[in-house]
Amino acid sequence: YVISAIPPTLTSKIHFRPELPSERNQLIQRLPMGAIIKCMMYYKEA
């Protein structure tokens, strides 16, 4: 598991294995910086 604390637009600089869905990458490319709402999520189990 990974917790990423970088702006979503910078995830295009990271090589993921397995690759992220193309729909997600397209959405991230279209979002301007600062248009994201931050939230915190807690899980009892991973």
Curated annotation (Swiss-Prot):
Where does the record say this protein resides? Answer: Mitochondrion outer membrane
Keywords (alphabetical) are:
Catecholamine metabolism, FAD, Flavoprotein, Membrane, Mitochondrion, Mitochondrion outer membrane, Neurotransmitter degradation, Oxidoreductase, Transmembrane
**Location, primary (coarse class):** mitochondrion
| Membrane topology field | Single-pass type IV membrane protein
| Record keyword Transmembrane present | yes
GO terms of biological process kind:
catecholamine metabolic process
Which catalysed reactions does the entry list for this protein? a secondary aliphatic amine + O2 + H2O = a primary amine + an aldehyde + H2O2; a primary methyl amine + O2 + H2O = an aldehyde + H2O2 + NH4(+); (R)-adrenaline + O2 + H2O = (R)-3,4-dihydroxymandelaldehyde + methylamine + H2O2; dopamine + O2 + H2O = 3,4-dihydroxyphenylacetaldehyde + H2O2 + NH4(+)
**According to the lineage, what is the superkingdom?**
Eukaryota
Which EC numbers does the record give? Answer: 1.4.3.21, 1.4.3.4
GO cellular component, as recorded: mitochondrial outer membrane
Q: Which Gene3D superfamilies match?
A: FAD/NAD(P)-binding domain
One GO MF term on file is: monoamine oxidase activity
Needed cofactors, names only, are: FAD
Q: How does it assemble?
A: Monomer, homo- or heterodimer (containing two subunits of similar size). Each subunit contains a covalently bound flavin. Enzymatically active as monomer.
Matches recorded under PANTHER family: AMINE OXIDASE, AMINE OXIDASE [FLAVIN-CONTAINING] A
User: Mind telling me what this protein is named?
Assistant: Amine oxidase [flavin-containing] A
This protein's species is Ovis aries
Give me the gene this protein comes from: MAOA
